[in-house]
Design a protein with these regions (language model features):
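Helix-to-loop junction immediately C-terminal to a conserved catalytic motif
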Residues: 42
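Conserved ABC transporter NBD signature motif
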Residues: 50-66
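Conserved ABC ATPase "signature" region
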Residues: 88, 99-115
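Catalytic Walker B motif of ABC-type/P-loop ATPase nucleotide-binding domains
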Residues: 143-147
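The feature captures the beta-strand-to-loop junction immediately N-terminal to the Walker
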Residues: 27-29
Length: 202
């Protein structure tokens, strides 16, 4: 798979096999294409050449045949809604989870579902945890997490890491991009480096 924008090469000859029940780590400097790779794997951007397929159990699936949860760095939710209202609004689109399940995931990530505080009033760490929550709440086949523990305190880091591990045990394909070397070493089964347009297993 390759990706170019106009005449600028972003990713070249990327060839990955991603299987369910595993966590894959991606490391690289800013500007090397990590976020673009995740956008392609999420189906948000089309590759210039090639395709994306996932292995769910023993079955090969095209990108449009799998459910995906995406956390892109600097993503934002609805500023005038509370934590519960944000997740409930997003959940109403696919109707895959109940209000009780939304409350449960909020509790587990350190939120009070009854708190009416607006998202715009949250700290950066709280915003980050809520964006993570929306990525995993519907238990998707594929979870793409760009800097999932960025801006979190120690408690928040542990809450997020534990939930990532649980999603792996459930059988999800999980991809983590992080500058936090501890995240990568603790969580990931395989690690890839993105450098000079290439994605290489290390």
């Amino acid at each position: 798979m390759c990706k170019s924008i106009h005449t600028n090469l972003i990713l070249d000859d990327v060839n990955l096999e991603l299987h369910s029940g595993a966590i894959y780590g991606f490391i690289g400097q800013n500007g090397t294409g990590k976020t673009m790779l995740f956008r392609i794997m999420a189906g948000l951007v089309r590759p210039s050449e090639g395709w994306v397929k996932y292995y769910i159990g023993d079955n090969e699936r095209n990108i449009g045949e799998v459910s995906k949860g995406v956390m892109i760095e600097n993503a934002e939710l609805y500023p005038e809604l509370s934590a519960f209202e944000n997740l409930d609004c997003l959940a109403s689109i696919n109707k895959k989870i109940s209000k009780r399940e939304i409350k449960e995931i909020l509790y587990r990530l350190g939120f009070d579902p009854k708190d009416h505080k607006k998202y715009s009033k949250y700290s950066l760490g709280m915003r980050h945890r809520l964006v993570f929550a929306q990525a995993v709440m519907e238990k998707p086949d594929v979870i793409l997490l760009d800097e999932p523990t960025n801006a979190l305190d120690e408690e928040g880091v542990n809450l997020v890491r534990n939930m990532i591990k649980e999603e792996k045990d459930r059988g999800a394909i999980i991809c983590v991009s992080s500058h936090n070397k501890e995240d990568i070493s603790i969580l990931c089964d395989e690690i890839f480096s993105i450098y000079d347009y290439k994605v290489t297993k290390i």
